[in-house]
């Protein structure tokens, strides 16, 4: 499920790094990679890992048909640095991105991170998407970005396509009309995650 894509992604990162001078992979030999990263989800929140409170049949089905990643930890306790670490393979401290974007603003300004903190993922950082493109993958990003404004959106970080992304990361509302950069067509009452 969630972790399956991470394991596949890591193996393809290694292939992409060693394939700089090699020809692109044959279309039939490439694996499809689906990487799902969720905010605020504990490993025991999925039924495939033992939850009796939450029912997660679709994720359970993905987990049963793929690999389960059971020995890892999150790079940070909040979204932006974790997402940046997954995309680049670097720790949040090396990226100077150790808090969620616009984190700890008023009334918590006294707790704000140091001045060296970046509030975006720099373009010079090579992302997993850029490495996968080097070996012929088409890349797509859907959902919360939260790694910088429009000049740092997924399409500037190696993703061919991006949908439902805003500067703050979430669509603002899940009911139509969606105030997102690449708006979808819809009608009153449509719910974004039902699409």
Features from the language model and the residues they span:
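Formylglycine-dependent sulfatase
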Residues: 2-9, 14-195
């Amino acid at each position: 499920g969630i972790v399956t894509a991470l394991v596949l992604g890591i193996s393809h990162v290694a292939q992409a790094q060693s394939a700089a001078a090699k020809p692109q992979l044959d279309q039939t030999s490439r694996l499809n990679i689906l990487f799902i990263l969720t905010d605020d989800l504990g490993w025991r929140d999925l039924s495939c890992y033992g939850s009796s409170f939450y029912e997660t049949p679709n994720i359970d089905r993905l987990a049963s048909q793929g690999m389960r990643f059971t020995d890892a930890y999150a790079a940070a306790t909040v979204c932006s640095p974790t997402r940046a670490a997954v995309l680049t393979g670097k720790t949040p401290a090396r990226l100077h991105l150790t808090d969620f974007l616009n984190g700890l603003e008023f009334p918590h300004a006294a707790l704000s991170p140091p001045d060296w903190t970046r509030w975006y993922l720099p373009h010079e950082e090579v992302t997993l998407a850029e490495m996968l493109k080097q070996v012929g993958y088409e890349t797509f990003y859907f959902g919360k970005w939260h790694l910088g404004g429009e000049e740092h959106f997924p399409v500037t970080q190696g993703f061919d396509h991006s949908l439902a992304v805003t500067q703050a990361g979430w669509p603002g509302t899940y009911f139509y009309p969606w105030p997102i950069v690449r708006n979808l067509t819809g009608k009153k009452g449509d719910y974004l995650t039902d699409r």
